[in-house]
Amino acid sequence: NQSERAEDSGNESDGDKDELSTLVEMGHHAPWDIDDM
């Protein structure tokens, strides 16, 4: 997945957060998001 790749890169862009918001909005909370926090 593109978002996973971006996260693996180390949160290079703020756009990742935006994508995350979209995922959460859809109801797909990514587990790696919590781990990153």
UniProtKB/Swiss-Prot annotation:
Processing and modification events after translation: Phosphorylated by host CK2. This phosphorylation is necessary for interaction with human BRCP and degradation of CD4.
Regulation: Ion channel activity is inhibited by hexamethylene amiloride in vitro.
SUPFAM superfamilies linked: HIV-1 VPU cytoplasmic domain
Chief location: host cell
Natural source organism: Human immunodeficiency virus type 1 group M subtype D (isolate Z84) (HIV-1)
Biased composition range(s): Basic and acidic residues: 26-37
Annotated GO CC locations: host cell membrane; membrane
An example Gene Ontology biological process: receptor catabolic process
InterPro entries: Vpu, Vpu_cyt_dom_sf
UniProt record similarity statement: Belongs to the HIV-1 VPU protein family.
Protein name: Protein Vpu
Membrane topology summary: Single-pass type I membrane protein
Functional description taken from the UniProt entry: Enhances virion budding, by targeting human CD4 and Tetherin/BST2 to proteasome degradation. Degradation of CD4 prevents any unwanted premature interactions between viral Env and its receptor human CD4 in the endoplasmic reticulum. Degradation of antiretroviral protein Tetherin/BST2 is important for virion budding, as BST2 tethers new viral particles to the host cell membrane. Mechanistically, Vpu bridges either CD4 or BST2 to BTRC, a substrate recognition subunit of the Skp1/Cullin/F-box protein E3 ubiquitin ligase, induces their ubiquitination and subsequent proteasomal degradation.
Pfam families: Vpu
Domain of life per record: Viruses
Region of interest: Disordered: 1-37
